[in-house]
Amino acid sequence: MKALLDLFKQATHEEEFDAIKIGLASPDKIRSWSYGEVKKPETINYRTFKPERDGLFCAKIFGPVKDYECLCGKYKRLKHRGVICEKCGVEVTLSKVRRERMGHIELASPVAHIWFLKSLPSRLGMVLDMTLRDIERVLYFEGFVVVEPGMTPLNRGQLLTEEDYLGKLEEYGDEFKALMGAEGVRELLRSLDVASEVETLHSEISKTGSDTKLKKLSKRLKILEGFQKSGIKPEWMILEVLPVLPPELRPLVPLDGGRFATSDLNDLYRRVINRNNRLKRLLELKAPEIIVRNEKRMLQEAVDSLLDNGRRGKAMTGANKRPLKSLADMIKGKSGRFRQNLLGKRVDYSGRSVIVVGPTLKLHQCGLPKKMALELFKPFIFNRLEVLGLATTIKAAKKMVEDEEPIVWDLLEEVIREHPVMLNRAPTLHRLGIQAFEPVLIEGKAIQLHPLVCAAFNADFDGDQMAVHVPLSLEAQAEARTLMLASNNVLSPANGEPIIVPSQDIVLGLYYMTREKVNAKGEGMMFADVTEARRAYDNREAELHARVTVRIKEVTLDENKNRVETVKRVETTLGRALLSEILPPGLPFSFVDKALKKKEISKLINASFRRCGLRETVIFADKLMYTGFTFATRAGMSIAIKDMLIPQEKGQILGAAEAEVKEIESQYTSGLVTQGERYNKVVDIWGRAGDAVAKAMMGQLGGEKVTDRQGKEVTQESFNAIYMMADSGARGSAAQIRQLAGMRGLMAKPDGSIIETPITANFREGLNMLQYFISTHGARKGLADTALKTANSGYLTRRLVDVTQDLVVTEDDCGTKNGLLVKALVEGGEVVEALRERILGRVAASDIINPETQETVFEAGTLLSEDVVDTIEALGIDEVRVRTPLTCETRYGLCANCYGRDLGRGYLVNVGEAVGVIAAQSIGEPGTQLTMRTFHIGGAASRAAAASQLEAKSNGAVQYTATMRYVTNARKELVAISRSGEILIADDSGRERERHKVPYGATLMVTDGAKIKAGAVLATWDPHTRPIITEYAGRVRFENVEEGVTVAKQVDDVTGLSTLVVIDPKRKSTSTKGVRPQVKLLDDAGNELKIAGTDTLVNITFQIGSIITVKDGQDVAVGDVLARIPQETSKTRDITGGLPRVAELFEARSPKDAGVLAEVTGTVSFGKDTKGKQRLVITDLDGVAHEYLITKEKHVTAHDGQIVQKGEMIVDGPVDPHDILRLQGVEALASYITDEVQDVYRLQGVKINDKHIEVIVRQMLRRVVVADPGDTGLIPGEQVERSEVLQINDEMIAAGKEPAVYDPILLGITKASLSTDSFISAASFQETTRVLTEAAIMGKKDELRGLKENVIVGRLIPAGSGLAYHNTRRRQAAGEDMGADRLLEGGETPAAENQEVA
């Protein structure tokens, strides 16, 4: 009996482990795993269905087919456990050992493992230092390889063809040894002395100068060092014994009709065994060499196919001509082991059904059909039936439930009470896609869902289905209740704003009841309180929209959160007075004393959350919903065709536009404008006309004339149903109404370009055939786009999750002093994002100081909550240094202070929160709303490009930035000669209000320090040409300005004036390739001018295309224009927008023609040009020259003698993020990526908090490249995890040795995911074969730190309560005896309900 109990104990005990290691198995190891050799290719006997002995399913090797029963039937039952039957040789045990016992095949000739041969870069090739082609020739018997040269002049590893070999054999006899096939390669590997190779490589690396050689050597060194560290012998890459998978994992199932369904692996193994046995026989028979060779080659190919079919040559096919699924195919790809079975399991205790709306539910409830609940909660009901003694056995209980006896329903109610269930709607794009609810039993078969959570699930009721899951254990129930209950998830984790916001009908109802109407019934009445007002409304004495006076009780909270009641008389509308009844205590009436549109309601809920806490807000949201539905019903909104009012002015607007277009057409025919200009102008005209019609239409829809009580005619906001729906934000938008009642406007072709004939009709008038046809273009493109977009967006999310999945908050504070300086985001003089929005919920990194009194207002380490931010704003502080995930110094994970507030909860983030995954979801979830296309600059965009002046938008004082340089010309105008100068405008307290870039050659209209009013012009310039301006006065002397060589004379047809234009050097004769036309300046004595204080000559070079405006010998003053460059040369670049742009940024791709940034701070000069390239030299402060070769077409923004800062752009073009990191550092890179990503999302109106993007940038920066290894034994140029280097450096410093010096390096998200420390995570992401091959050779150890690895091995994830569990487990493993009270340290913070919201 004891034995039996032990058996059960052993089944439930789970393995505890801290890491998983992967390596190469030696032949002896493989034999030790095996329970016997598979000698025959037979599987099972087709008549008896019993496995054949020594075959692929042999019971003697793999174990019995039935539990505790040997094959011949001599021993049956449990009492013979462990006996080995002497007749059939089968051990009597459980049949499930057939899932774990392996066999093996002794190969007659060694075989190379294809992964180490063909998975690039070829590991075999790297170890042997031979090319893949050569090794393949040896392996597949096309050539010999010299293994031992002996005393001959041959080299080890040299290849010989058959003839060579025979010739050498005659020449040297058996002095040398050469082999072919895997034996040859095995001997080479066996004779490799790893230790001495490593030493020689180390010395070679220190000697070598060339980069390519260094790369090659360090790669090889890395592999050999991996062998050394992990104790793996290189010859194990060649298989001598092949393991055989347990038979239950490659099943053979008899179908009816005598056929068998089998796993492809059986076919592949059969081929290997057949060829192996044939080879053995040939060797015994001493067959001719050529036949044996052929058989060996076939064996090699058979093993290749088994391991990775199709990797080399044609894939082996089965009877039905499809390629067989090999071992490698089993684990890789979407339907492989990792993604299909380990990361995506099916779950029991779950069901799915269609959803319908549940407007009577409370926020934390969902309606669950009784039938479904009965099935889901079966075990709980069985338990109750037994406990209450209503059923004696489970079997009896089962019968009662199946017969649906009345008592069962009562018990179901009892079981379900307080037992939350989880609802999930696919696709689950963010964590709010699964939420917990308390079930309410309902009749019918559909699940009822609360309307307010639809936004989070992105659910609607047009046939959507949802899945229900039951959390079983008490811990699971507790977590579902405290963390996942819908009423605990009011805020969106992406931006911290409420996600439980009324929409559609509810908004319409609330909007309708808070609107006011002139001269409504009951206008001017007075009410003692709201109840009296309600009576008047119920008795139809007063309308909802009437202006009335009501006494309203207002409850506010003072500083100590005590309730203060005040009663005041307000003049308001009856509807708003009714609405005031449901306000939570703490919100003043002023919040609802206006027409409530969707935005206002969102603000209302936000304010309620911040002031009154979570509980009150949830109750309030529910009440809002009930009220909204009630009054939407009362309103009885309806729309008719007549509601779509077509504006009277439409005809004349269209007429004017047509006239303008005719005018442009005639200009075009007479050759005044080009085809491109004509197209742009026409599109522009129609765009403006469409806007004008829309404006007229909204004006007409939005107002109506009525008579007031005095009999005067007044205009009030319209009660037109269509207008109200759009205005309230319930449904529809101005753009859609414009198509119904205005004009449809311009349409796009499928390639994204705009068709220049607009659709002037609208849907109310109806479209003619041509118009309808043009419309269909856009609609179809939209559908095609959506399909593509979903896939792309999903893939982006997957990559983001993969790169951040191991980032968890692991400690409270890392103690770093670093942070990010944040100021308001200003673009083109307009504040795009205010400072408060950017710092809210962060932790201050340094003290915040009052700019006027210089005293500390908030100390470093303060969480910047709403109140703090309000104070900061009031004090006029315009930049704050905050903690950021980028500079967090926690080794593995993040600290709570660097992350700041948990946006979905409203207080400082808990230890154990998986912030990486949340960041990935927040960025990926709106992905489907982004556009897919690249925009062509055309129409409206080109109009914006031709700006010619800067205007101030606010009052204040002008400040020039340090980069601004200017000269005063003869007309006493200030002319800017810097390219990166900016004008700031600061208010009285010195805060920056706006900033503007000033282009080169602009005339500055204001001086530094001047006080200006809003609307003042700051600078003007000619938008069509770019000047070349002299900074010095003197007499012009041309050099290399030769007509027909470097310049061409152009005569204007109309005016007859001639100008000199610098021509492209491509058209010059070869002798003048290196000359560039330039100007030297002479002083009065005729000497060449030098730049003040230096020996450098003033020399101004003309660019290609410049029109020279001065004559040789002319005197010029400072600030005069020497030449103009027409602006038409600037090509319009396509802007990559939407999803592709976000992916491009996160993948850290270098743009095509990237701009060049200065590597050092120094002075610019131009060197001698080469063919097609110009040479730019920057001489740094120590006098070292740095050269750049730049193609002639590129526009160099720096000019001769200019002093540039390190990281400043000197050649125009898009920036390469890698350059920003290298030259300007991590902060600049982070702000670049953040701003660029935010631009894309902002365009679509999506709000995402910056910190999510920073979290991802942190993960992109997690590797460093070793610059100087010190005493660490790392290799220069090697990429290592930052945490690993820090660890090694700590050890070095402790030992008093030299630590390594390293530089940060930026990896794209795919690269970063694949290069993570965890090989399990990387293998389950992409390129499984490559990752596993590399890991096996290096003998890698996976510490199971991330979430994904732990899910794959089936443990709790190290986040949330799982973090506490793992910490405890590790401490116990370390032998610490822990008190129960300390068990939960470092785990969850108490539930949201017991926490006051900050």
From Swiss-Prot:
Cross-referenced Gene3D superfamilies: 1.10.132.30, 1.10.150.390, 1.10.1790.20, 1.10.40.90, 2.40.40.20, 2.40.50.100, RNA polymerase II, clamp domain, RNA polymerase Rpb1, domain 3
Sites where the protein binds Zn(2+) 2: 814, 888, 895, 898
InterPro entries: DNA-dir_RpoC_beta_prime, DNA-dir_RpoC_beta_prime_bact, RNA_pol_asu, RNA_pol_N, RNA_pol_Rpb1_1, RNA_pol_Rpb1_3, RNA_pol_Rpb1_3_sf, RNA_pol_Rpb1_4
Enzyme Commission no: 2.7.7.6
EC class name: transferase
Pfam families: RNA_pol_Rpb1_1 (PF04997), RNA_pol_Rpb1_2 (PF00623), RNA_pol_Rpb1_3 (PF04983), RNA_pol_Rpb1_4 (PF05000), RNA_pol_Rpb1_5 (PF04998)
Identification of the protein by name: DNA-directed RNA polymerase subunit beta'
Gene for this chain: rpoC
